[in-house]
Amino acid sequence: MSQTAAADAPKPLDPQLGGAAIAPPPTIPDPSTLILRLLTPAEKEASWITNSVSWAGRLTQTDYFAREAANEASRLLRNGGIRFWGLTTEKEGGEIYAAVETLKKRVLVQTSKGFDVEDAYGIASVYTPAKYRGNGLAGTMMRKLGEWLDTEEANCRFSVLFSDVK
């Protein structure tokens, strides 16, 4: 093989970098074409795999999953108290471009006549996979979530965003 042909030949993949290191940048659809919808159980677990890279800390992936499942089953969150959302396409099983959780709580709201019991939502675990960051997807997702919170279905008196970003 000539030196020119050798120089033009594909380089073997570096096992430390893997295929993703040489893959072209991901194609990101126009954010206005994406929808916010509840994730299926399989999609929820896929989002846990994705965000565990940033959030598991010293936990193994198995321990991270166990913690998330325990949180979901806790008395405060079971029976629909937590919802897992994804910014994605219409179809189930499509790419999840960003994800977020909502935690529904009954709260006391003081009024001039006393107290009312209302629904409120905590917004937590806002996450965009690294390959999609910097494209406004989290902002799009939060706008769409805000629109849902304003619906009669949500019946949301107010919401609060939880963040551990330092």
Residue ranges of predicted features:
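Short amphipathic alpha-helix that is part of the acyltransferase structural core
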Residues: 2-98, 104, 112-115, 122
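Acidic, serine/threonine-rich, low-complexity C-terminal transcriptional regulatory domains
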Residues: 101-107, 141
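An acidic- and aromatic-residue-enriched active-site/binding cleft used to recognize and process polar
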Residues: 105-107, 126-128, 163-166
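Catalytic micro-motifs at enzyme active sites that drive phosphoryl/nucleotidyl and oxygen chemistry
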Residues: 109-113, 148, 158
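Beta-strand-rich binding-surface signature
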Residues: 118-120, 158
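Conserved acetyl-CoA-binding loop-helix of GNAT-fold acetyltransferases
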Residues: 125-128, 133-150
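Conserved GNAT acetyl-CoA-binding A-motif
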Residues: 142, 149-164
